[in-house]
């Protein structure tokens, strides 16, 4: 059971919206269902989804246990950047989901890892996310670290918590960014009305900082590098859109129609990943090579600008 004490910032907010912000991995419809089924109480009494919170309300939430399907190992090739007895660092391809979820119970990175590693994956995140300590979006490519044991998982989780992991992405964005470098410092949280999106305009956003640097300009497009100080869901996509430069191909935060035919999702690649190794204590860094589609797109943009 989880308990929340309502402060002045949340006063007057609908309870279903408030809880959707607290449980970012749950949909609003799921939250409304558990409220209807009596799993949510305010001051020890059941409420309806449209209940308006009052200052100092005590909210109790008991999440019902979900029946999780069996995850089947699948012989899916992995692009391995580094591997030892504690961790495996891979270059994730486009269109691959990191872990199983409704609608994606096969073909995920976890299915591939279970085949490659067998039982050598940490169990801290449960049977649906063995070894997974962080993730990137389905259409984002690049470097990820997976933990083979709980000791490694705890070490990497702590590094994520204190923002000591080095994460550098490259992206192509709409528009000509005038300054050569800059920082976006804007809290990121669940969008107030569209639960599938994140936003910089929300009541309970969490601190999010992205440092960007221009690598190349192509007139109407800019090739940039982004270094994360924090790692919120969709952080780079939301931050760049918030300053008027959404990622090319990102139909969620940018234009609905992509000018480049065949481009699937945002043009975003997790190039560099640097960690403190959980056993040796030494700094370890991998660099994931750009995927073919990204290289071809850069060549195309260079040719257009000649």
Which residues make up each language-model segment?
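Conserved hydrophobic positions within beta-strands
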Residues: 80, 173, 211-214, 247
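RNA pseudouridine synthases
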Residues: 1-183, 187-189, 293-301
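Active-site flanking residues adjacent to catalytic metal/cofactor-binding acidic residues
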Residues: 90, 238, 249
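Thr-Gly-centered strand-to-loop micro-motif
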Residues: 42-43, 99-100, 147, 198-199, ...
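Short, surface-exposed loop/helix-turn segments at secondary-structure junctions
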Residues: 199, 249-262
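The conserved catalytic core of RNA pseudouridine synthases
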Residues: 126-158, 166, 170, 185, ...
């Amino acid at each position: 059971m989880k308990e929340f004490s309502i402060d002045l910032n949340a006063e007057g907010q609908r309870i279903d919206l408030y809880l959707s912000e607290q449980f970012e991995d749950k949909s609003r419809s799921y939250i409304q269902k558990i409220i209807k089924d009596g799993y949510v109480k305010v001051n020890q009494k059941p409420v309806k989804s449209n209940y308006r919170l009052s200052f100092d309300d005590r909210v109790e939430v008991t999440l019902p246990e979900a029946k999780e399907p069996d995850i089947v190992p699948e012989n899916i090739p992995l692009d391995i950047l580094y591997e030892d007895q504690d961790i495996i660092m891979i270059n994730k391809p486009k269109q691959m989901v990191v872990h199983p979820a409704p609608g994606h119970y096969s073909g995920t990175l976890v299915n591939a890892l279970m085949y490659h590693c067998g039982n050598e994956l940490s169990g801290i995140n449960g049977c649906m996310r063995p070894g997974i300590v962080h993730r990137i979006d389905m259409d984002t490519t690049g470097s990820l670290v997976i933990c083979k044991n709980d000791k490694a998982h705890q070490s990497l989780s702590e590094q994520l918590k204190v923002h000591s992991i080095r994460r550098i992405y490259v992206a192509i964005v709409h528009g000509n960014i005038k300054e050569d470098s800059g920082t976006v410092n804007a809290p990121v949280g669940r969008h107030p009305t569209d639960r599938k999106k994140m936003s910089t305009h929300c009541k309970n956003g969490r601190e999010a900082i992205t440092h960007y640097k221009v690598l190349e300009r192509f007139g109407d497009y800019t090739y940039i590098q982004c270094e994360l100080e924090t790692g919120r869901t969709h952080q780079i996509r939301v931050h760049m859109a918030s300053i008027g430069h959404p990622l090319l191909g990102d139909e969620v935060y940018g234009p609905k129609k992509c000018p480049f035919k065949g481009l699937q999702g945002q043009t975003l690649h997790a190039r560099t990943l640097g960690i403190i190794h959980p056993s040796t204590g030494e700094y370890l860094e991998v660099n994931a090579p750009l995927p073919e589609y990204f290289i071809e797109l850069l060549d195309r943009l260079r040719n257009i600008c000649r």
